[in-house]
Amino acid sequence: MNPVRKKRLIIVLAIVAGVGAAVGLALSALQQNINLFYTPTQIANGEAPTDTRIRAGGLVEKGSLQRSEDSLNVRFVVTDGAKEVTIAYHGILPDLFREGQGIVALGKLGGDGVLVADEVLAKHDENYMPPEVTKALKDSGQLKHYENGKAAGETSYNQEGK
């Protein structure tokens, strides 16, 4: 093989190997940052992993908010109309957090079925609902009830449909 061709081949192979390594590292980093969304029904049915960070969303059950007297610990229940999941959070809740409103919590699911959230996102206006929560309510057949309650002036959602 001609020395010039051999040198070109080595350079091309080095470039291909470098690009391959860069793509591999990028895909690995992206995979670690993926937070899949799970509904309370999926979490209650055991479909959500307990060892990775997930997003869970739904409507905050009326009367479920429990605040600690001596710390920033908060517990509340989120529902999609079919099942419920308890969320534990340490920190200051967003200003727009209210019972009966849609939220998305990011955290890890404990072995006891409680989602330990490190971030809670509240919807930003009265009519907005996260797309994942809307889909979960639609799938459980509770979206129309929620919308009818909002049209009638209700400010909260309960599972019995009253």
Swiss-Prot record:
- What is the annotated localization of this protein? Cell inner membrane
Q: Which Gene3D superfamilies match?
A: Nucleic acid-binding proteins
For this entry, the protein name equals Cytochrome c-type biogenesis protein CcmE
Similarity comment: family membership: Belongs to the CcmE/CycJ family.
This protein's species is Pseudomonas aeruginosa (strain ATCC 15692 / DSM 22644 / CIP 104116 / JCM 14847 / LMG 12228 / 1C / PRS 101 / PAO1)
Q: Which gene encodes it?
A: ccmE
Taxonomic lineage: Bacteria, Pseudomonadati, Pseudomonadota, Gammaproteobacteria, Pseudomonadales
Listed GO CC annotations? plasma membrane
Q: Which residues cross the membrane?
A: 9-29
Q: Provide the alphabetized UniProt keywords.
A: Cell inner membrane, Cell membrane, Cytochrome c-type biogenesis, Heme, Iron, Membrane, Metal-binding, Signal-anchor, Transmembrane, Transmembrane helix
Q: Which cysteines are joined by disulfide bonds?
A: none
Region annotation (Disordered) ranges: 139-162
